[in-house]
Amino acid sequence: MTRYKAIVAYDGSNFFGFQVQTKSGVEVQRTVQGELNKAVNQMAKQPVTPIKVVGASRTDTGVHAFGQVVHFDLPFDINPVGVSKGLNTLLPRDILIKAVTKVSDDFHARFSTHAKRYFYRVSTTAFTDPFKRHYTGHFHWHLDTSRIQEALPDLIGEHDFASFAASGNQTASTVRTITSAQLIEKPDEQELVFVFEGNAFLYNQIRIMVGVLLEIGNGRREIHDIQRLIAVKDREQARFTAPASGLYLDEIDYGENPAN
C-alpha cells in the first residue's frame, strides 16, 4: 500500500460537513468525505476492503476549504500527478484536488498537524448580497473596527477557551494556543476578513470568537470582554455564533518533517 497526501478545496454550501454520516452503515447525507471515499475507491477498482479517506479537519455544514488535507492508502504506486488528475475526473465540481504527494506510512492528516489557519469573511452591506450569502457571514449593524483591532490581542497565547466551545465539543481539554489573530479591512468590497492561526481549534470556536468580536465592534461588549470570557469558562456568556457560510479552512501546517 502507498500512502498519499492530498490538498483539497471545496465549496461547502451543498455539503453536510466533511465527515461521513451513516445510519445502519448507509450514508444519509452528502458529505465531502463521502464523495472523496467514492472517488478513491472507484480509482482503486473497488477493493474488497474499502479505502477510507482521512481528513485533517472535520468542517461543519456550510464551511468551505481552500486547504483541507487528507490522506489515503492505494493498493498500487503511481505518480501523484496521475492520482490528482484521476480523482478530479471522478469528483463533483464542488470539490477540487489541488495537489497530491506521496508520504510515509506514519503520516496522518489529522494527528500530524502542527498548526491550522482559518479565515472568516464578513459582509457589511446594508442588505444581504445574494451572490455572497453562501460565502460570507452578514453583519449590517454599525461596527467600530478600531475596537475590534484593540480586542484581538486578547486571544493570543495559550488559554482555556471553554467559553468559546459549542456544546457539541468532544475534546478532553479546551486549552488551545492561538498564535495570530488579525482583522483585514476591505472597505471597497464592504467586507471584513478575520484570520486566525493556532495549534488547533475547538468545535465552533472560530465562529464564536467572530461573534464576540463583532459584538465588541458594535459596542454591545466592552473592548476587553474576551479576557472576562476566558476567565469565566461559560459558553452561555459568549452568546452569538457567526454563521458557517463565512468560515474557510485556509491552510494546514505539518512542520519541518520532510515525510509530511
From Swiss-Prot:
A Pfam family the protein falls into: PseudoU_synth_1
GO molecular function: RNA binding; tRNA pseudouridine(38-40) synthase activity
Domain of life the protein comes from: Bacteria
Keywords from the named record: Isomerase, tRNA processing
Active-site residues, Swiss-Prot/TrEMBL: 60 (nucleophile)
Biological processes, Gene Ontology terms: tRNA pseudouridine synthesis
Chemical reaction(s) catalysed: uridine(38/39/40) in tRNA = pseudouridine(38/39/40) in tRNA
Annotated SUPFAM superfamilies: Pseudouridine synthase
Family: Belongs to the tRNA pseudouridine synthase TruA family.
Subunit structure: Homodimer.
Function: Formation of pseudouridine at positions 38, 39 and 40 in the anticodon stem and loop of transfer RNAs.
Name of this protein: tRNA pseudouridine synthase A
